[in-house]
Swiss-Prot record:
Presence of keyword Ribonucleoprotein: no
Matches recorded under HAMAP family: CH60 (MF_00600)
Gene name, Swiss-Prot/TrEMBL: groEL
Species per Swiss-Prot/TrEMBL record: Pseudomonas putida (strain GB-1)
Name of the protein this chain belongs to: Chaperonin GroEL
Keywords, ordered alphabetically: ATP-binding, Chaperone, Cytoplasm, Isomerase, Nucleotide-binding
Entry EC number(s): 5.6.1.7
């Protein structure tokens, strides 16, 4: 096992503090409407320019192992805030830096670190409760657009497109962000349920100009196995032909003789039919087939529940107003499923979202939920260059998380004002002893840090602005973008309450851990032996020694 380097007490904390400050100083430059840019060198390709705090934090690794530990712990603050609310990472970093710097001063002055931590925790709980009281519900799309704009570093085109997307697909709908091909941002909304499987044969196409197959008022046959034998399908095909309606077959696969017969029947006009593979794989495929069944009021023909293709009747088939199949996608519009059953299915998926611990599973479940409950909106981000595209896409994703958080827990005045107003909750708060009181006072100073940093980045005097904001009340604050004072909500400067709360909780949690650190252990740097000369390369036919 490699030798370890161990540091204790003050010398350990000093090293850690250096790392904390290096990372936080780089990240906090991006805070606020006048946040500065940070340039990141890449091992290949052009450097990236960003105003996104997380991107900056991710790039930082320090040479000294102990300093690096401090930097990585602050990175943890940012990712904790990001996991909880999807935004607020820079605010969380600024708060953590303030708490750690003040806290370590107090520890160096002889305070008890455990009591300091208890004081910080007590004050944090009071501020979080006060933030809940300050928050106002975020109902209309104007407020949603304002939240999106602030989070996207004051880019109102991003705020507006997110508000429009939310209006179209509802609060439950899925909004995905993709790289577009033009210079402008575009929004496209998919109504109904869309899944990423296209027609199995181009001979099903009935609109050659757009290369799509459209079925009006079709019946849907949902099967969870491969269909290769046409004899299994005959009873259903005959019943559908008698009913005189088109048919969409969604199965694990349709191949060989079965597919050929369907194509021939379709081309001769005997039965208007199209076939498509079921979406997903394994258990997820079964679940998605069941979703389609619930949406269209049909049943999945599965041997697991004792149904086979030969015994299937029209009652087992789903109904929809229209189905559109392209080469890549299938869209089912206006399924005829019962509302009560769809609601029950939505409830079931929501319960699974709550239980799952995997981010991938959660994302897939949310997609399924949106397809049943709302719709899917796709924001295509437009930009002039690859570098700008990446940076803009990261900002759109941040803004999207922020607006979701705003809808969930409401909004508070932005620009660091909400934290200053929440100070009212800890003005008279007292701990059980003097050291806890120092912890409470320490947090009282730390919560001003975001407001001071936003002001400093805008080139103004932090102390003057902080004092003036503290003298005001309610939503009165400082608009760093214009240099004016006024009502933050009226000026459209809002933060989601959830983002502010998560940032403070993450910062207090990691800050408390750092203050109570007593020892640090890292791999000892390996002593590389001094490089000697090359050995004599004798023995190579007459080449004595190579000089």
């Amino acid at each position: 096992m490699a030798a370890k380097d161990v540091k204790f007490g003050d010398s350990a904390r000093k090293k850690m503090l250096v790392g904390v400050n290096v990372l936080a100083d780089a990240v906090k430059a991006t805070l606020g409407p006048k946040g500065r840019n940070v340039v990141l060198a890449k091992s290949f390709g052009a450097p990236t320019i960003t105003k996104d705090g997380v991107s900056v934090a991710k790039e930082i690794e320090l040479k000294d192992a102990f300093e690096n530990m401090g930097a990585q712990l602050v990175k943890e603050v940012a990712s904790k805030a990001n996991d909880a609310a999807g935004d607020g990472t820079t605010t969380a970093t600024v708060l953590a830096q303030a708490i750690v710097n003040e806290g370590l001063k107090a520890v160096a002055a002889g305070m008890n670190p455990m009591d300091l931590k208890r004081g910080i925790d007590k004050a944090t709980a009071a501020v979080v409760a006060e933030l809940k009281n300050l928050s106002k519900p975020c109902a209309d799309s104007k407020a949603i657009a304002q939240v999106g704009t602030i989070s996207a570093n004051s880019d109102d085109s991003i705020g507006n497109i997110i508000a429009e997307a939310m209006e179209k697909v509802g609060k439950e709908g899925v909004i995905t962000v993709e790289e577009g091909s033009g210079l402008e941002n575009e929004l496209s909304v998919v109504e109904g349920m869309q899944f990423d499987r296209g027609y199995l044969s181009p001979y099903f196409v009935n609109k050659p100009d757009t290369m799509v197959a459209e079925l009006e008022g079709p019946l849907l046959l949902l099967v969870d196995k491969k269909i290769s034998n046409i004899r299994e399908l005959l009873p259903v095909l005959e019943a559908v032909a008698k009913a005189g309606r088109p048919l969409l077959i969604v199965a694990e696969d349709v191949e060989g003789e079965a597919l050929a017969t369907l194509v021939v029947n379709n081309m001769r006009g005997i039965v208007k039919v199209a076939a498509v593979k079921a979406p997903g794989f394994g258990d997820r495929r079964k679940a998605m087939l069941q979703d389609i069944a619930v949406l269209t009021g049909g049943q999945v023909i599965s041997e697991e529940i004792g149904l086979s293709l030969e015994t299937a009747t029209l009652e087992h088939l789903g109904n929809a107003k229209r189905v559109i199949l392209s080469k890549e996608n299938t869209t089912i519009i206006d399924g005829a499923g019962a509302d009560t059953e769809i609601e029950a299915r939505v409830k079931q998926i929501r319960a699974q979202i709550e239980e799952t611990s995997s981010d991938y599973d959660r994302e897939k479940l949310q997609e399924r939920l949106a397809k049943l409950a709302g719709g899917v909106a796709v924001i295509k981000v437009g930009a002039g260059t690859e570098v700008e595209m990446k940076e803009k896409k990261a900002r759109v994703e941040d803004a999207l998380h922020a607006t979701r958080a705003a809808v969930e827990e409401g909004v508070v005045p932005g620009g660091g004002v909400a934290l200053v107003r929440a100070l009212a909750a800890i003005v008279d708060l007292k701990g059980e002893n003097e050291d806890q009181n120092v912890g409470i006072a320490l947090l009282r100073r730390a919560v001003e840090a975001p407001l001071r940093q936003i002001t400093a980045n805008a080139g103004d005097e932090p102390s003057v602005v902080a004092d003036k904001v503290k003298q005001g009340s309610g939503n009165f604050g400082y608009n760093a973008a214009t240099g004016e004072y006024g009502d933050m909500i009226e000026m459209g400067i809002l933060d989601p309450a959830k983002v502010t709360r998560s940032a403070l909780q993450a910062a207090a949690s990691i800050g408390g851990l750092m203050i109570t650190t007593e020892a640090m252990i890292a791999d000892a740097p390996s002593e590389a032996p001094a490089g000697g000369g090359m050995p004599d390369m004798g023995g190579m036919g007459g080449m004595g020694g190579m000089m």
